[in-house]
Curated annotation (Swiss-Prot):
PANTHER family: LEU/ILE/VAL-BINDING ABC TRANSPORTER SUBUNIT, LEU_ILE_VAL-BINDING PROTEIN. This is Leu/Ile/Val/Thr-binding protein. Belongs to the leucine-binding protein family. The gene is livJ. Keywords: Amino-acid transport, Disulfide bond, Periplasm, Signal, Transport. It comes from Salmonella typhimurium (strain LT2 / SGSC1412 / ATCC 700720). Disulfide bonds join C74-C99. The keyword Ribonucleoprotein does not apply. Its main location: periplasm. This protein is a component of the leucine, isoleucine, valine, threonine transport system, which is one of the two periplasmic binding protein-dependent transport systems of the high-affinity transport of the branched-chain amino acids. GO terms for cellular component: outer membrane-bounded periplasmic space. InterPro entries: Leu-bd (IPR028081), Leu_Ile_Val-bd (IPR000709), Peripla_BP_I (IPR028082). Residues 1-21 form the signal peptide.
Length: 365
């Protein structure tokens, strides 16, 4: 291998300081900044560990994988700029993006430019419903997660008066509507369905409305910054309402915001892959670097790299890799993964968990 090239820039930062001519560059795109940067931390932790492990075992036919980090801040406009930067940098493989609202516009560019994208986090069904050939994911869909939440609400919680809140974004509103649809199919109507503004911090009006309407259950579609504030302010006002949210709220930063008010929150998310015995060596390696292995996107990202590895061992052509994966079963840290023709995982299941004030989650009963 020859021709050392230093990878640097305001947007792109290499996880490895040097790349060589025979190295295989992989764009790892997520939020390094902005209100949900914690999810980017999970993604980059998983990517770094997966690439280290793949390279330690010989890489791709002797060539090393080199990750190049890009920050889209989970912002659609910045995601488009990043996607164009990836194109200009000549990278053919993308792990990312994270948020559905930024993943979808970026995927338009990747598809047009012949770049393979495997997202470890974007759950919007629309992403893979457009006939694209180069888009896959290693997570489930809102159309899976919403019914899982609705089923638990109907069968386990059985509340009397339900409100559904969302952050007016593709991910949050899509999930909220999926939950609402699931409840309606179960014969239950919600008292109100409404949106808040992402970034908002004062929820006194919402809390007053919940109290006035005697709401005993709230489903929130969105991310942890707003969920944390809603929990904290609701408990401060004396509300005993049960709250529930998706994997977008299941972040230790939620507990930092809500404190003890986070205890007992219900969340739907992928299983706790850090608790799988076979994954212990990976958990130990991540902990040795003073990083947190518990985040869901650590593992969906690791699995995305394993999937890319399987594809690259077959071909270096993005279209051929996508075609290969849609007919293959890949052994990963999440278990065996296989995809349908749209690029969605077959048989992916979300679980329901109790969230605790210390930032951990246990299986809900």
């Amino acid at each position: 291998m020859k021709g050392k090239t230093l990878l640097a820039g305001c947007i792109a930062l290499s996880l490895s300081h040097m790349a060589f001519a025979d190295d295989i560059k992989v764009a790892v795109v997520g939020a390094m900044s902005g209100p949900v940067a914690q999810y980017g931390d999970q993604e980059f932790t998983g990517a770094e560990q997966a690439i280290a492990d793949i390279n330690a075992k010989g890489g791709i036919k002797g060539d090393k994988l080199v990750a190049v980090k890009y920050d889209d801040a989970c912002d659609p406009k910045q995601a488009v700029a990043v996607a164009n930067k990836v194109v200009n940098d000549g990278i053919k493989y993308v792990i990312g993006h994270l948020c559905s609202s930024s993943t979808q516009p970026a995927s338009d560019i990747y598809e047009d430019e012949g770049i393979l994208m495997i997202t470890p986090a974007a759950t919007a069904p629309e992403l893979t419903a457009r006939g694209y050939k180069l888009v896959l994911r290693t997570t489930g869909l809102d159309s899976d997660q919403g019914p899982t939440a609705a089923k638990y609400i109907l069968e386990k919680v059985k509340p009397q008066r339900i409100a559904i809140i969302h952050d007016k974004q593709q991910y949050g509103e899509g999930l909220a509507r999926a939950v609402q649809d699931g409840l309606k199919k179960g014969g239950v109507n919600v008292v109100f369905f409404d949106g808040i503004t992402a970034g908002e911090k004062d929820f006194s009006t919402l809390v007053a409305r919940l109290k006035k309407e005697n709401i005993d259950f709230v489903y929130y579609g969105g991310y942890h910054p707003e969920m944390g504030q809603i929990l904290r302010q609701s408990r401060a006002a004396g509300l005993k309402t049960q709250f529930m949210g998706p994997e977008g709220v299941a972040n230790v930063s939620l507990s930092n915001i809500a404190g003890e008010s986070a205890e007992g929150l219900l969340v739907t998310k992928p299983k706790n892959y850090d608790q799988v015995p076979a994954n212990k060596p990976i958990v130990d390696a991540i902990k040795a670097k003073k990083q947190d292995p518990s985040g869901a996107f650590v593992w969906t990202t690791y699995a995305a790299l394993q999937s890319l590895q399987a594809g690259l061992n077959h071909s270096d052509d993005p279209a051929e890799i996508a075609k290969y994966l849609k007919g293959a079963t890949v052994d990963t840290v999440m278990g065996p993964l296989s995809w349908d023709e749209k690029g969605d995982l077959k048989g992916f299941e979300f679980g329901v968990f109790d969230w605790h004030a210390n930032g951990t989650a246990t299986d809900a009963k």
